[in-house]
């Protein structure tokens, strides 16, 4: 059975699914005898297994990622001569016993180091995987696929081993690196070092309060105590264990080189592939590693050129794990946890390799892992130098280094050593000297001495950049001398005299006090900032500047001191510049105040000068008058008594003076009446004053009741304006303006007739308060109609005058329509009688008889004839003719009724009553 027939049979057996290929061609027409005899067609001779279908097809969800590199040149053609086949779906089988999501890893025995990998399957392929275990063990592990999120363990191609790409990644997995030691001597030293680290771990304290960062050791030597159902949160941080003192770390390049030389490379790679692939990734878990399995460390980014530590994690590929495997004894083989990846919010530029003590099973139960990991994401990067040094200071074992490798490891000293014995007489910390490994020159170039934490105070004292500047203090030689210091002077002077003496100096003292307060505030603010900065440095890792300074030689230290002195001088000049700018602004403000005071004093001085000039002029007049009176008195004393003869002018003045005295005597006699009248006026004034006070109190009480806030804001004006326009269009009344108490409106229904309403008198007399403005542009008909409406409004409904007027206008609106229609038939005009009655006059001309008929009807009668169907309509007619023609009343009634019947159907012949004039 060929492939095409098998696909068609599978399509018929399936209820749902496509029966033909995507290209919609006739498949049966191609299966001819010539087609089968074609030597280029390959017909299968055996049943294709499921594994071959999965490996060879690109239409399934199971993708073989391990063979991607070998299948790069594979091309899939979708030409018209190629047929795409449909496949039946394998139904999921319900098993009575559900396989756990995390399967126990098989321990690696020393006799089966290079055992083959077990194929990975999903939950829908468990039965097939069980039947194919033996087949999968005999085949190449590179052909095994990957299901969903299971870890991928791919062995780098031996032909490409020289590329040494430590950053290549298979799919989206991130793998931690492991180191392989091919030297058998290293294994013995590792076992001995693990025993010492076990003793140290018993007294170590965990450095992280939230989620610990743990070490993942050799993947063939992990503890078997891993709980199968352990929850996994996000991604586990996997790093290397800290090896005390000087630790040999081999780079990925040298490890690849050593692995490439090894003979059992393929066996170890397959064994590790099996171990890693059997651990599915179920999102993440926080993993506590066992510190009793130390191993050689390596890192590509532990120390950069600036000497900064690297924090948190390192990204390592699966190639490094294959190339850095460590062989261990069977007693130290452990099960290993699944690889996990983590996505950090902030990627740190530096990372440090750390390890944490082993916790009990209840500590790693996963109760607080979710919250701890979330907080850990926010708080990273975090330094772990205290954890590193607790191990580093208690262990003296040193691992060896392979020849030809480069060491990039580093050790740190923590603040916990301050309390120990490594402190000198001055209280400074002394870095513990470590025993370096005996390696060649090439390996020695990559080893860094341990670092030490330094405080900001120590750095400032060492460099000599203090904050107290004695030069500035010495320059302040200006002193304020107070003469009140003597005891006798204080006793002899009163307070007003002292105040008067120092009145000018008091503002200067106030300015100086304000200046001192500003300096004091600035100094306190600087102190607080310095304390905060010092606290931040104490709590965090020492800055790069401190590490570089204390790790440099004397020449470099002197250069750094000179640079810091230069920076200090520049900062001091900047601070002085800011201070002088502040002083300048203060002095400018004082100058403005003094200028304002000077102008005020000048104005007062000018006023005083004017007053002095007035006083001097009055004084001069008084002096002259005094001298004249004295001269008159002397002259009168010297003259005899009979020698005085008054002149005519003097006599006239005397008579006038006498008349004035007589008038005053009369008013003096009537002083009682004046007194009584004054009393009555005072009483009236007091009464009016009381009335005013009561009225003011009433006004105040009314004001309290009225809400003071604004009813409308400026944002409400556009909305109110639009509302007013809508009301104008609905009612036909337009508001023109509102000035004082006069409201001007225009009626759209009456050809924009303008009416002014005085709201002050509207309540008392509505009719008189409304004034109709008869402009020349408006039609007289609207004016007379509105006047008629005002007269016809009932007097008893004056309270609702405007509403009644509006309803009447709405009711009489058709009257304008009939008048306009009448204008289309006859020339119409409106006249007014002496009684101010509006008359409607229209003209009818008879061409045959050359006679003109003038009909006159009052506006009220015309309105009654329009709106009512009963009653007589009085109409006057005047005949103007050039011939002797005098038609009868019947003829005129028939004529006028015939002409206006189409416009005014209510004007019938029986209702029209003509009167000849």
Curated annotation (Swiss-Prot):
Region (Interacts with the BUB1-BUB3 complex) residue spans: 165-183
Required for interaction with KRE28 as annotated region, ranges: 507-638
Acidic residues composition-biased segments: 414-424
Biased composition (Polar residues): 24-36, 106-126, 156-170, 245-257
Signal peptide: none
Motif (MELT): 146-149, 169-172, 232-235
Chief location bin: nucleus
Molecular function GO labels: microtubule binding
GO terms of biological process kind: homologous chromosome orientation in meiotic metaphase I; kinetochore assembly; mitotic sister chromatid biorientation; mitotic spindle assembly checkpoint signaling; positive regulation of meiosis I spindle assembly checkpoint; protein localization to kinetochore; sister chromatid biorientation
The name this protein goes by in its record: Outer kinetochore KNL1 complex subunit SPC105
Protein species of origin: Saccharomyces cerevisiae (strain ATCC 204508 / S288c) (Baker's yeast)
């Amino acid at each position: 059975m060929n492939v095409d027939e098998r696909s068609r049979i599978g399509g018929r057996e399936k209820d749902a699914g496509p029966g033909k290929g995507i290209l919609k061609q006739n498949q049966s027409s191609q299966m001819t005898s010539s087609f089968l005899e074609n030597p280029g067609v390959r017909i299968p001779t055996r049943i294709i297994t499921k594994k071959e279908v999965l490996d060879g097809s690109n239409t399934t969800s199971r993708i073989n990622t391990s063979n991607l590199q070998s299948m790069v040149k594979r091309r899939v053609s979708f030409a018209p001569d190629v047929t795409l086949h449909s496949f039946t779906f394998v139904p999921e089988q319900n098993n009575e016993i559900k396989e756990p999501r995390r399967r126990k890893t098989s321990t690696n025995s020393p006799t089966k180091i290079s055992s083959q990998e077990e194929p990975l399957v999903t939950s829908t392929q468990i039965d097939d995987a069980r039947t194919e275990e033996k087949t999968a063990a005999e085949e190449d592990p590179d052909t095994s696929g990957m299901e969903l999120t299971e870890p991928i363990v791919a062995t780098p191609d031996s032909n490409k081993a020289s590329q040494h790409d430590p950053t290549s990644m298979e799919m989206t997995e991130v793998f931690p690196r492991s180191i392989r030691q091919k030297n058998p001597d290293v294994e013995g030293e590792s076992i001995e070092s693990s025993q010492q680290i076990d003793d140290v771990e018993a007294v170590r304290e965990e450095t992280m309060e939230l989620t610990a960062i743990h070490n993942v050791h050799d993947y063939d030597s992990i503890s078997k105590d891993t709980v199968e159902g352990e929850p996994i949160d996000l991604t586990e941080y996997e790093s290397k264990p800290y090896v005390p003192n000087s630790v040999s770390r081999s780079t990925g390049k040298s490890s690849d080189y050593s692995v490439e030389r090894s003979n059992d490379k393929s066996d170890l790679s397959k064994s590790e592939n099996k171990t890693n692939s059997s651990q599915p990734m179920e999102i993440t878990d926080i993993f506590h590693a066992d510190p009793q399995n130390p191993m050689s460390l390596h890192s590509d980014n532990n120390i950069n050129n600036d000497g900064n530590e690297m924090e948190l994690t390192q990204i390592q590929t699966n190639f490094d794990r294959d190339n850095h495997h460590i062989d261990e004894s069977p007693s130290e083989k452990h099960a290993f946890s699944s690889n996990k990846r983590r996505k950090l919010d902030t990627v740190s530029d530096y990372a440090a390799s750390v390890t944490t003590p082993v916790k009990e099973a209840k500590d790693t139960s996963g109760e607080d892992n979710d919250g701890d990991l979330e907080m850990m994401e926010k708080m990273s990067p975090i330094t772990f130098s205290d954890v590193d040094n607790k191990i580093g200071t208690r262990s003296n074992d040193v691992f060896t280094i392979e020849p030809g490798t480069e060491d990039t490891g580093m050790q740190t000293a923590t603040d916990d050593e301050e309390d120990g014995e490594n402190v000198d007489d001055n209280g400074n910390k002394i870095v513990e000297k470590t025993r370096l490994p005996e390696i060649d020159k090439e390996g020695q170039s990559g080893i860094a001495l341990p670092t030490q934490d330094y405080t900001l105070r120590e750095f400032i004292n060492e460099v000599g950049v203090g904050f107290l500047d004695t030069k500035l203090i010495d320059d302040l030689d200006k002193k304020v001398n107070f003469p009140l210091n003597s005891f006798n002077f204080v006793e002899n002077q009163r307070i007003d005299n002292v105040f008067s003496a120092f009145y000018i100096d008091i503002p200067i003292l106030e300015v100086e006090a304000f200046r001192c307060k500003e300096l004091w505030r600035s100094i306190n603010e600087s102190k607080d900032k310095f304390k905060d900065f010092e606290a931040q440095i104490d709590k965090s890792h020492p800055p790069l500047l401190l590490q570089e300074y204390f790790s440099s030689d004397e020449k470099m230290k002197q250069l750094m001191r000179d640079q810091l002195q230069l920076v200090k001088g520049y900062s001091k000049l900047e601070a002085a510049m800011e201070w002088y700018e502040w002083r300048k602004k203060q002095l400018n403000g004082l100058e403005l105040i003094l200028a304002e005071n000077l102008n005020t004093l000048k104005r007062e001085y000018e006023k005083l000068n004017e007053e002095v000039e007035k006083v001097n002029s009055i004084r001069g007049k008084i002096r002259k008058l005094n001298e004249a009176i004295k001269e008159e008195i002397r002259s009168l004393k010297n003259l005899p008594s009979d020698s005085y003869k008054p002149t005519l002018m003097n006599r006239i003045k005397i008579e006038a003076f006498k008349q004035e005295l007589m008038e005053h005597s009369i008013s003096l006699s009537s002083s009682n009446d004046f007194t009584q009248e004054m009393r009555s006026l005072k009483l009236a004034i007091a009464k009016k004053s009381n009335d005013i006070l009561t009225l003011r109190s009433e006004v105040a009480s009314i004001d309290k009741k009225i809400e003071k806030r604004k009813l409308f804001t400026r944002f409400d004006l556009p909305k109110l304006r639009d509302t007013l326009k809508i009301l104008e269009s609905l009612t036909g009344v337009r508001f023109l303006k509102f000035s004082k108490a006069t409201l001007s409106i225009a009626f759209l229904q009456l050809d924009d007739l303008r009416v002014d309403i005085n709201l002050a008198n509207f309540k008392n007399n509505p009719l008189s308060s409304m004034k109709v403005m008869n402009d020349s542009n408006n039609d007289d008909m609207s004016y007379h109609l509105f006047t008629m409406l005002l007269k016809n409004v009932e007097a008893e409904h004056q309270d609702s005058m405007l509403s009644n007027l509006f309803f009447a206008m709405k009711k009489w609106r058709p009257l304008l329509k009939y008048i306009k229609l009448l204008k289309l038939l006859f020339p119409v005009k409106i006249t007014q009688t002496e009684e101010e009655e509006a008359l409607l006059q229209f003209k009818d001309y008879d061409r045959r008889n050359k006679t003109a008929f003038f009909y006159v009807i009052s506006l009220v009668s015309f309105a009654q004839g329009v709106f009512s169907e009963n009653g007589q309509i009085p109409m006057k007619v005047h005949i103007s003719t050039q011939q002797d023609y005098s038609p009868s009343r019947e003829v005129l009634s028939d004529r006028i009724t015939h002409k206006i019947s189409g416009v005014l159907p209510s004007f019938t012949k029986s209702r029209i009553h003509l009167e000849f004039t």
